Amino acid sequence: MIVVTGAAGFIGSNLVKALNDMGRNDIIAVDDLTDGTKMFNLADCEIADYLDKDQFLEQIIAGEFDGKIEVIFHQGACSSTTEWDGKFMMSNNYEYSKTLLQFCDRTKCQYIYASSASVYGGSEKFIEQRDLEKPLNVYAYSKFLFDQYVRQQKPNCQVAGLRYFNVYGPREQHKGGMASVAFHFNNQLNANGICRLFEGVDGYENGQQLRDFVYVEDVVKVNLWLWQNSEVSGIFNCGTGQAQSFNDVANAVIAHHGKGAVEYIPFPDKLKGAYQSYTQADLTKLRAAGYTAEFKTVEQAVPEYLSWLATQHFIGE
């Protein structure tokens, strides 16, 4: 049996779909469907069962899944970087992750979990080492803290954490303001022909802030590779290894539609000091572990994503 937490979310649902494509339907999907629109992410997927995240945790603690689970892909978390309820974040992200790790350690179950590039905060280097980790918000701190916990353990199972950089692609529409800029630029262009980007900040020209934009399909491939290589443990960056600008994303959206323009808007005061103007994954450790697949560029993946979006109809549209 395979468990995917956050299964109705962005990366989790893409992972479930990819497992289906590999012929695996023996999947327990774990999530919180308070936002019922997330069910659309699983509507075309095959699963064995669905469990609410709290119910699943209770059954894990009670030992009801002992010896029954092959791997847990732990993608579930509150991923809002603007959420400042620290008590909620610690319970939902940190303590929950610890409980699942303790289960996997006890039952020798593989544990592959979502960390985040946000742990690097304002760092200018993105290498998996302690002196470069400077979280700027409580979400990032919750992820950082669990990575620290993992480092101090000596579990009897595979434990692999992936520090996701700026992931974009199908099945992210439920994320609202936290969805990718590719998603928002596409919506803006369809609405009024204009992609709105922030003006320059931190010494960057307008729209030239740089991020490591990584396509969700590639993120899923790394997760599956780790599952298939159970001897690999550790915390790894998961990005393309090549930063691209917000202008690059906007231009890819405009090129796909064959129309549109860019407008630069003032940088919000509330984000100053809590914003990463540059991220670029250092993939040295992931490559050294044996991962050889290439990652799609913005120019390659954005058209693929927008073609998928054009086939979808979402609630509220």
Curated annotation (Swiss-Prot):
Q: Give the protein's cofactors.
A: NADP(+)
Catalytic function, reaction form: ADP-D-glycero-beta-D-manno-heptose = ADP-L-glycero-beta-D-manno-heptose
- Active site residues per record: Y139 (proton acceptor), K175 (proton acceptor)
Task: Name the positions where substrate binds.
Answer: N166, G177, H184, F198, E199, G200, V201, R211, Y275
Query: Mind listing the GO biological process terms from this record?
Result: ADP-L-glycero-beta-D-manno-heptose biosynthetic process; carbohydrate metabolic process
Query: Domain of life, per the record?
Result: Bacteria
Q: Which EC class does it fall in?
A: isomerase
Q: What does the note under cofactor report?
A: Binds 1 NADP(+) per subunit.
Q: Does the keyword Isomerase apply?
A: yes
Q: Pfam families from the entry?
A: Epimerase
Keyword annotations: Carbohydrate metabolism, Isomerase, NADP
Name the pathway: Nucleotide-sugar biosynthesis; ADP-L-glycero-beta-D-manno-heptose biosynthesis; ADP-L-glycero-beta-D-manno-heptose from D-glycero-beta-D-manno-heptose 7-phosphate: step 4/4
- Which GO terms of the molecular function aspect are on file? ADP-glyceromanno-heptose 6-epimerase activity; NADP binding
Binding-site residues, NADP(+) = 10-11, 31-32, 38, 53, 75-79, 92, 143, 167, 175
| The protein's Enzyme Commission number | 5.1.3.20
The record describes the protein's role as: Catalyzes the interconversion between ADP-D-glycero-beta-D-manno-heptose and ADP-L-glycero-beta-D-manno-heptose via an epimerization at carbon 6 of the heptose.
Q: PANTHER family from the xrefs?
A: ADP-L-GLYCERO-D-MANNO-HEPTOSE-6-EPIMERASE (PTHR43103:SF3), NUCLEOSIDE-DIPHOSPHATE-SUGAR EPIMERASE (PTHR43103)
| Assembly information from the UniProt record | Homopentamer.
Into which family does the record put it? Belongs to the NAD(P)-dependent epimerase/dehydratase family. HldD subfamily.
Q: What is this protein called?
A: ADP-L-glycero-D-manno-heptose-6-epimerase
Whose protein is this, by species?
Shewanella piezotolerans (strain WP3 / JCM 13877)
